[in-house]
């Protein structure tokens, strides 16, 4: 600020002094007058030709100053007058004598010497701008800031040399004046006011000699055009800041070339050159340091730091996202790279920040955000870290950048290259320069130019079913296009980071949720695959018992009936289907029809053996609705539509471990099954009177029973439980549904193959026991048999005995083929007994039968 004022008043003083040029004719006339000196009212000597209006204001001021000094002590004599006015007048006259020397040269054609410099009085005088006070407005700060010892630097030497030349020629001028007959007043005449006045300007004891007269003559003369450049050069050299730091190299921190106008003096001969230099200096290179380097202004430095910070953040975000989501982003967004670059070329022309000086736009300083310093030519400057170096990017590089087709013109200066080390550390050279992204424009939304490369995807872009993409391209919605992908540096970057993390997290969570796809369960009633294939489909609601899986490889009965379906699944080897509709969900026809006649008798015998095998049956029989897949080597129709109401123990066992619907798991029954098989192997089938515990468990019984019950509903189970005695357990043919758990049970039984019992002997013994023992049917059972049809007497052709599920006595539970009321199967008790015995024997006896399930060892034992 002080500098501005200093240059301003220097310029104004020069202009004012130039406004009133002197008249050379008047000066010549003054020399030809009767006396060159005249006394003004104050007593100061003046040329006669010089008029008040023609004299410059500075001369008038100088004149007034000594007048006041003379009036202070009018009677004090020359010594008093000299003591009062000597210092200010002499100092001021020194400057005027310098200016007047050139003026006299133009007027007379000769260089006139000056008394200011070499000579007894002038040798001690130097220009001191602290005493400019009478000539121009007093600015103390400027006066103090200009040291006297620095005045004679550089160009002032030229001025002094010219003045010395003037000093050598001054005697010639005075000789010419004396030849013209000009009479000079004697120095010692006290009456001559001129002599008295002349002594006032000279040291005591000296009269106004030739030097003094020449000094007084040139005191009030003004600058001429010829010497105007010299004075201007002197003033510029004194006031210019460039001269101050030329030797020391210390830059004036507050100096700004763009803000300090140069002296607009167009009168001098060098004015065109200086005007051109002024234009160059007005190109805003920023503040100067040592006339070479540019300092970063606070506004630009702050904004550039902010911009570079967010650029680095965005770059790190893009790199992280490229590493994590690169495979998904490279495809869809790779095509937008060129288009986004071309679009940003137009957007980059917009101003970055409102605080930026509009004039600074003319200086295309570099913004190579994507170009590391290694690609730039080495800087020649000596700038320290933190100072912007005007030579590092240079105008040439900026022009090249502006001319390059793909990259926009640089719009913001880069303070330094301090961050290039980090950039080169993380920059992948294979990717090439990233190029300016729309993030460089603080106020421009990216939605104008499309999504930028590597922009984090919006969390809103996740859609149902798109988890496998993990990061699908965002749809053209408001959030992804206008807001989340805009180029707002501050909050936008944070949103992008959070959004990317959330998107990745959501993708991982959704991927984990999918897990292995569950297999579709087979439709109810779908027959199970043969046991050899072991591909039995799983019934949705029923855990099919392992017995079905135990069906023999030769022709295991596939009895995988659904709970609601009342179908008889015939084994491929079966000769005939059960006559009745067999609503029991799995009445498996696995044998010949001979066994069907023995069903009633078998029920009775089974009634005896139910108590023993209730536990085993609960473990071994799958409570699912599949009918027992007891398959003998010879096919025999097994009326497994067992609708017999089991005693509570049996039902509880069925519902417990084996029936999933009633709270059990087949896996829990496997250990029990192994124990039961061991017990069965140890059992010895005895005579008729033997308690039911003597009978080995029938393993096919559960199928028909539970299939029927499921078909009829859980309430029927309750009724059957109530009707059956706890001692009698339904040892239905231990039906096993075709399920993976059945296969597990089958494997378990295979492992227990060592429990084999001779099927023939066992069957014979069982048959004998069955034949010998009378039918032990309770009255209730007899009534049921009568109601159904002939129990024992009828052969295979006997009509189907219809057993009401509610009316079944525990004794007659077992294998009542007529368990299905609607489609009862005619069965004779002996045949049922035979089948029961055969199945019981084979359960422990034949490994393949064990594997296939509780199958009959013989069709008839």
Curated annotation (Swiss-Prot):
Biased composition (Polar residues): 362-384, 615-629, 719-730
Pfam families: AMER (PF09422)
Membrane topology designation: Peripheral membrane protein
Task performed by this protein: Regulator of the canonical Wnt signaling pathway. Acts by specifically binding phosphatidylinositol 4,5-bisphosphate (PtdIns(4,5)P2), translocating to the cell membrane.
Biased composition (Pro residues): 518-530
Name of the molecule in the record: APC membrane recruitment protein 3
Keyword presence, Lipoprotein: no
Gene: AMER3
Keyword Membrane belongs to the record: yes
Composition-biased stretches (Low complexity): 584-595
InterPro entries reported for this sequence: AMER (IPR019003)
Organism domain of life: Eukaryota
Family: Belongs to the Amer family.
Keywords: Cell membrane, Lipid-binding, Membrane, Wnt signaling pathway
Segments for region (Disordered): 1-77, 179-206, 261-289, 351-415, 514-558, 576-644, 716-742, 786-822
BP-aspect Gene Ontology terms: regulation of canonical Wnt signaling pathway; Wnt signaling pathway
Signal sequence, start to end: none
One of the record's GO molecular function terms: beta-catenin binding
Native species: Homo sapiens
GO CC field: plasma membrane
PANTHER family membership: APC MEMBRANE RECRUITMENT PROTEIN 2-RELATED, APC MEMBRANE RECRUITMENT PROTEIN 3
Record field: compositional bias (Basic and acidic residues): 598-609
Cell compartments where the protein resides: Cell membrane
């Amino acid at each position: 600020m002080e500098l501005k004022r200093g240059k301003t008043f220097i310029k104004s003083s020069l202009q004012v002094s130039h406004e009133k040029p002197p008249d050379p004719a008047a000066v010549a006339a003054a020399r030809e007058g009767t006396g060159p000196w005249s006394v003004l009212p104050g007593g100061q000597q003046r040329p006669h030709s010089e008029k008040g209006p023609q004299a410059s204001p500075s001369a008038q001021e100088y004149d007034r100053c000594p007048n006041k000094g003379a009036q202070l002590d009018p009677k004090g004599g020359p010594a008093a007058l000299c003591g009062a006015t000597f210092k200010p007048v002499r100092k001021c006259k020194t400057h005027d004598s310098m200016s007047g020397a050139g003026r006299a040269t133009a007027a007379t054609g000769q260089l006139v010497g000056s008394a200011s410099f070499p000579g007894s009085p002038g040798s001690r005088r130097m220009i001191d701008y602290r005493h400019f006070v009478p000539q121009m407005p007093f600015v103390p700060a400027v006066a103090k800031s200009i040291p006297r010892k620095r005045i004679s630097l550089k160009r002032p030497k030229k001025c002094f040399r010219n003045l010395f030349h003037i000093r050598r020629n001054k005697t010639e001028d005075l000789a010419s004046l004396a030849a013209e007959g000009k009479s000079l007043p004697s120095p010692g005449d006290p009456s001559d006011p001129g002599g008295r006045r002349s002594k006032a300007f000279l040291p005591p004891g000296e009269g106004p000699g030739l030097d003094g007269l020449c000094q007084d003559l040139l005191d009030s003369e003004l600058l001429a055009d010829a010497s105007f450049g010299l004075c201007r050069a002197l003033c510029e050299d004194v006031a210019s800041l460039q001269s101050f730091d030329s030797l020391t190299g210390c830059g004036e921190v507050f100096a700004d070339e763009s803000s300090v106008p140069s002296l607009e003096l167009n009168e001098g001969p060098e004015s065109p050159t200086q005007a051109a230099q002024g234009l160059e200096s007005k190109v805003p290179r920023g503040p100067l340091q040592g006339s070479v380097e540019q300092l970063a202004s606070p506004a630009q430095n702050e904004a550039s730091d902010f911009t570079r910070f967010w650029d680095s953040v965005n770059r790190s975000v893009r790199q992280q996202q490229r590493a994590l989501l690169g495979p998904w982003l490279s495809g869809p967004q790779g095509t937008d790279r060129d288009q986004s670059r071309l679009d940003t070329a137009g957007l980059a022309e917009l101003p970055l920040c409102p605080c930026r000086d509009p004039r600074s736009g003319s200086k295309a300083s570099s913004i190579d955000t994507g170009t590391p310093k290694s690609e730039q030519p080495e800087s020649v400057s000596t700038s320290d870290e933190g100072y912007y170096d005007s030579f590092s990017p240079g105008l040439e590089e900026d022009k090249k950048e502006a001319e390059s087709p793909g990259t926009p013109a640089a719009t913001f200066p880069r303070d330094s290259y301090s961050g290039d080390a980090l950039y080169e550390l993380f920059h992948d050279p294979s990717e090439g320069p990233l190029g300016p992204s729309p993030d460089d424009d603080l106020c421009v939304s990216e939605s104008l130019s499309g999504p930028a490369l590597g922009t984090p995807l919006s969390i809103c872009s996740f859609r149902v079913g798109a988890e496998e993409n993990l990061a699908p391209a965002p749809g053209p919605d408001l959030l992804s296009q206008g807001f989340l992908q805009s180029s707002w540096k501050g909050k936008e970057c944070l949103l992008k980071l959070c959004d990317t993390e959330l998107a990745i997290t959501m993708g991982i969570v959704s991927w984990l949720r999918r897990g292995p796809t569950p297999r579709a369960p087979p439709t109810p009633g779908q027959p199970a695959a043969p046991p050899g294939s072991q591909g039995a489909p799983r019934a949705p609601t029923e855990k099919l018992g392992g017995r079905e899986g135990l069906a023999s490889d030769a022709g295991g009965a596939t009895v995988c009936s659904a709970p609601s379906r009342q179908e008889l699944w015939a084994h491929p080897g079966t000769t005939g289907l059960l006559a009745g509709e067999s609503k029991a969900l799995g009445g498996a026809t696995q044998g010949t029809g001979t066994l069907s006649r023995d069903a009633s008798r078998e029920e009775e015998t089974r009634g005896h053996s139910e108590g023993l095998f209730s536990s085993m049956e609960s473990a071994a029989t799958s409570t699912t609705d599949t009918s027992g897949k007891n398959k003998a080597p010879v096919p025999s129709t097994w009326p497994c539509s067992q609708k017999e109401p089991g005693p509570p123990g049996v039902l509880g066992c069925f519902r417990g471990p084996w029936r999933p619907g009633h709270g059990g798991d087949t896996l829990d029954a496997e250990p029990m099954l192994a124990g039961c098989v061991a017990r069965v192997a140890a059992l010895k089938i005895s005579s008729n009177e033997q308690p039911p515990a003597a009978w080995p468990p029938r393993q096919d019984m559960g199928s028909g029973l539970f299939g029927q019950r499921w078909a009829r509903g859980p309430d029927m189970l309750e009724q059957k439980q109530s009707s059956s005695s706890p001692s009698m357990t339904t040892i239905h043919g231990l039906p096993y549904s075709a399920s993976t758990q059945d296969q597990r049970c089958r494997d378990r039984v295979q492992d227990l193959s060592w429990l084999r019992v001779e099927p023939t002997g066992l069957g014979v013994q069982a048959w004998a026991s069955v034949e010998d023992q009378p039918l032990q049917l309770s009255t209730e059972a007899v009534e049921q048999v009568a109601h159904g049809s002939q129990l024992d007497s009828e052969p295979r052709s006997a009509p189907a005995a219809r057993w009401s599920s509610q009316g079944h006595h525990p004794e007659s539970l077992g294998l009542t083929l007529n368990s299905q009321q609607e489609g009862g199967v005619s069965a004779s008790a002996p045949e049922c007994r035979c089948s029961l015995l055969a199945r019981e024997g084979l359960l422990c006896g034949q490994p393949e039968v064990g594997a296939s399930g509780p199958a009959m060892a013989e069709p008839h034992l």
